């Protein structure tokens, strides 16, 4: 479905729920499987999930489905790239940090925030179940403004439960992919892309017109040398 179609569905469901009386039954269908590694497919060395906005819930499901049900020693490395418009828009980061803290050798998390504050401040985050968690944003020391301009490392960190997560200002760029996710024949990497239509389009090209099939690979991932077998649009 397109973003507009999803928004219309959410609006209709909200009106329906608002009209219900207390104690009225609500029937839920699902969950719907949007992606599953084929049984005949070889396990990749790494699964990268690029998520934008509220679609971050899918990355939390990936972490829990892999690490809570399998032996981490035999599981692929899991990398999550999470892009949001602002610090306040970040969701479920504390849940992902819990996995990062428990499995530091298997989980990596990077954040991209379009509108970063100029100074260090507190960030009000919450878990997937809505429990508020305090976090602190700190600016990393850099020698000069020129060094900040040319440095590929982030200039901010989000500290949650004692764990520092790198935060990049702006959006995920082609340079980010080519420097941090350079394609290699010796390292099997599968990239999952989940987010608003514009987010998916920029990274991997649009899905097919039927909104169900994948469509041709495009965007930054294709420009970085990835193939259709290595990318899945959710």
Predicted regions and their residues:
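Reductase modules of NAD(P)H-dependent flavoproteins
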Residues: 81-234
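Histidine-anchored nucleotide/phosphate-binding helix
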Residues: 56-72
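Short, Lys/Arg- and Gly-enriched loop/turn segments at beta-strand edges
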Residues: 33-42
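Short alpha-helix capping/helix-loop boundary micro-motifs
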Residues: 11-18
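Structural motif
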Residues: 46-48, 190
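Loop/turn positions that initiate beta-strands
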Residues: 21-25
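Single conserved hydrophobic/aromatic residue that forms the stacking wall/gate
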Residues: 1-10
